[in-house]
């Protein structure tokens, strides 16, 4: 029965009949191969040296996690120790034969399981020389997987915390060793925040086509984990980071009554005209240099104005005579006659272009008005008041007769009923002398009730034409004014007669 029971066990699980020394050597090689596979498939750290230059080679640095859960590591180490105690390695193992892991990214303190102080308990299977390989592998493999997963979880948590503190954008990417920050900026038209803090219109992709990590069959957990993380990162990369919205100016609400009043009352103080009158004016310093500058400027301006006026006078003179000299002589003789008829013996005049231009304009206007009325070169004497009114003058009949006598002193045309154009125009210049004659106001026409003159302008033209500015006077006020003036005149005549007697 014992032989029959032993046969199916051998069929199910093959046993290895070896000596004690061969078994230890085989277990040693198996464990070493297992750790070598794990170390080959491990991913190197993802920390990027952003200050590394292009010519520098990437350095493999160790990453020390911030915090490690001691309880979890203690349980894993204890399980590993228990599994190795079951295998019961010999006491003769020296320090040179210890299994040492290559330096990793994480400074993880491994237990010294092969120390000489630890004593292994003997097992019956070793004394018998029969050990099952499948049991050894089933014991070792889950314990090593648990240890690796615990290390990887601690590594990922600590690395993500550090990256969140160092970088303003989520770069929890598993980059290959040797990649720089310049390789991230490859594709245009996408915005993200790089390590310097400002927005760039470029995107980044992981250059993992040629540098993909080769995972072995034993590290399938890492392969699944990395495939999931790469997919999530690619999805996040396709979504461009939206820039922060610009701060818009605040829209003011409806103004209150106080705001309206404040806007109306812009300044509290006196009126601007009163302020200008009473304010202190700054004294303007007049220096000889400033006087010379002003004099030169005025000379330039006045010279330009006089030259322009001379050009106008020369063009207008062609309408009154053959040349400029003949027109000036004509103007001088007319001024001499006007002053002589007014009783002024100093008939010398100084030529002024402005006065000459004024006389030429008036003479041209009178000639046009005379041409409208004449059927031949002469008009009748009784048509003179109408001719004068067309020219804008309203003298009385007595003034017209007196001027007729002054103009026709020779006696030949004095009793004629026809008048030429030249004599009619000269009568107007005698009644209303030009500016060049310089006749005093005492010899000019006086203002009367029927022919008022205000500031040298006849008011009768407004009465005749019916100007809207004129108002109908109150007859009582006018009667009182006329009666007072008549009474004063009679009283003056009475006092004069009393003095003579």
UniProtKB/Swiss-Prot annotation:
PROSITE patterns in UniProt: IQ (PS50096)
All copies of domain IQ, residue ranges: 290-319
Region (Disordered): 237-262
Biased composition (Basic and acidic residues): 237-247
Signal sequence residues: none
InterPro entries: IQ_motif_EF-hand-BS
Protein name: IQ domain-containing protein M
Organism placement in taxonomy: Eukaryota, Metazoa, Chordata, Craniata, Vertebrata
């Amino acid at each position: 029965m014992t032989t029959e029971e032993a046969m199916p066990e051998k069929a199910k699980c093959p046993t290895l009949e070896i000596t004690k020394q061969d078994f230890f050597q085989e277990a040693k090689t198996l464990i070493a191969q297992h750790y070598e596979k794990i170390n080959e498939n491990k991913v190197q750290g993802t920390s990027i040296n952003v200050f590394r230059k292009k010519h520098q080679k990437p350095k493999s640095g160790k990453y020390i996690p911030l915090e490690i859960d001691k309880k979890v590591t203690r349980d894993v180490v204890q399980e590993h120790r228990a599994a190795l105690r079951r295998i019961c390695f010999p006491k003769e193992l020296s320090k040179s034969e210890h299994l040492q892991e290559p330096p990793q990214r994480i400074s993880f303190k491994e237990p010294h399981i092969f120390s000489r102080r630890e004593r292994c308990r003997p097992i019956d299977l070793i004394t018998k020389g029969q050990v099952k390989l499948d049991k050894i592998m089933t014991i070792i493999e889950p314990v090593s997987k648990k240890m690796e997963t615990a290390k990887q979880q601690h590594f990922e948590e600590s690395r993500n915390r550090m990256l969140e503190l160092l970088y303003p954008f989520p770069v929890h990417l598993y980059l290959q060793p040797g990649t720089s920050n310049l390789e991230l900026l490859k594709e245009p038209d996408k915005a993200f925040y790089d390590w310097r803090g400002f927005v760039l219109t470029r995107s980044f992709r992981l250059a993992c086509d040629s540098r993909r990590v080769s995972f072995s069959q034993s590290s399938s957990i890492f392969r699944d984990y990395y495939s999931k993380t790469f997919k999530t990162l690619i999805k996040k990369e396709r979504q461009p980071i939206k820039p922060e919205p610009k701060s818009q100016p605040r829209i003011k609400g409806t103004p209150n009554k106080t705001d309206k009043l404040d806007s109306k009352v812009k300044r509290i103080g006196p009126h601007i005209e009163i302020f200008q009158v009473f304010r202190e004016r700054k004294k303007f310093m007049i220096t000889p240099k400033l006087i010379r500058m002003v004099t030169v400027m005025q000379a330039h301006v006045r010279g330009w104005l006089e030259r322009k006026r001379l050009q106008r006078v020369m063009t207008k003179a062609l309408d009154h005579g053959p040349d400029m000299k003949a027109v000036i002589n004509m103007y001088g003789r007319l001024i001499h006659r006007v002053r002589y008829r007014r009783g002024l013996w100093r008939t010398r005049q100084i030529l002024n272009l402005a006065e000459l231009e004024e006389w030429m304009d008036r003479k041209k206007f009178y000639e046009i008005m005379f041409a409208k009325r004449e059927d031949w070169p002469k008009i009748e004497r009784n048509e003179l008041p109408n001719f004068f009114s067309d020219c804008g003058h309203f003298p009385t009949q007595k003034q017209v007769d007196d001027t007729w006598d002054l103009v026709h002193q020779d006696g030949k045309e004095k009793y004629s009923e026809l008048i030429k154009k030249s004599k009619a125009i000269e009568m107007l210049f005698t009644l209303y002398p030009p500016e060049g004659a310089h006749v005093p106001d005492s010899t000019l026409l006086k203002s009367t009730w029927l022919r008022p003159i205000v500031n040298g302008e006849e008011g009768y033209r407004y009465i005749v034409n019916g100007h809207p500015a004129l108002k109908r006077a109150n007859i009582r006020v006018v009667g009182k004014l006329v009666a007072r003036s008549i009474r004063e005149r009679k009283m003056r005549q009475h006092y004069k007669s009393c003095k003579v007697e």
